[in-house]
A protein has these predicted regions:
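Single conserved hydrophobic/aromatic residue that forms the stacking wall/gate
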Residues: 1-12
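A conserved nucleotide-sugar
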Residues: 16-33
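Glycine-rich phosphate-binding loops of nucleotide-dependent enzymes
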Residues: 33-40, 69
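Nucleotide-activated donor-binding/catalytic signature segment of Leloir-type glycosyltransferases, i.e.
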Residues: 41-57
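A donor-sugar binding/catalytic signature common to diverse glycosyltransferases
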Residues: 55-103
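A short, well-ordered alpha-helix in the C-terminal region of glycosyltransferases
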Residues: 147-159
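C-terminal alpha-helical cap of glycosyltransferases
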Residues: 161-175
């Protein structure tokens, strides 16, 4: 089982279709919140029989997934705490990205990387979020054991417990 979290688009649909044709055993899960534009996702994805949609159940979806593609800030931390290997995608309109990139001073965009102060998960931004890159990164996740990533997730989890969340809040404030 595999999780695509948050916003779905034609790129996701193409990717799910690709894996249906090339590896029919793979099942995708789309984890959404009730606040998401439910009708958009259901309409776009309805003919994909290798995709299930779940609402407001991110933790269980991530726990059941072998790996994930995450497009939500808090879901990246949830996936790390569930020790679910992932890569992160962020794509927004150009103006929003331009403004945010000038306001936020961080080398990373995902919470696991920010809190670890190093790259532990791959981040794809803006134009990097395309079909070829998603297939490439997902193939890497599927074909590696991801031990180092899981070890980094364990270390992050321990550091959040041991630092009594002070590190979490200080890093977030510095952004």
């Amino acid at each position: 089982t595999h999780c695509i979290s948050s916003a779905a688009s034609d790129v996701y649909k193409r990717q799910v279709s690709h894996y249906k044709n090339h590896n029919p055993k793979i099942k995708f899960i789309l984890a959404l919140t009730k606040n998401s534009r439910k009708y958009c996702f259901e309409e776009k994805m309805k003919e994909l029989d290798n995709l299930s949609i779940f609402y407001d159940d991110t933790k269980n979806v991530l726990s059941a997934s072998d790996f994930s593609i995450i497009a939500s800030g808090t879901a990246t931390l949830e996936a790390a705490l569930c020790k679910t290997p992932m890569f992160v995608i962020y794509k927004t309109n150009f103006l929003s990205y331009f403004i945010l990139s000038r306001l936020i001073y961080s080398k990373f965009i995902s919470l696991p990387n920010i809190l670890s102060e190093k790259k532990i998960v791959k981040e794809l931004l803006q134009s990097q979020v395309n079909f070829n890159n998603l297939v490439y990164e997902l193939d890497i996740l599927m074909n590696e054991d991801n031990k180092e990533m899981k070890l980094n997730f364990e270390n992050l989890h321990r550091s959040l417990i041991n630092d009594n969340q002070s590190k979490f809040f200080s890093v977030i404030e510095s952004i």
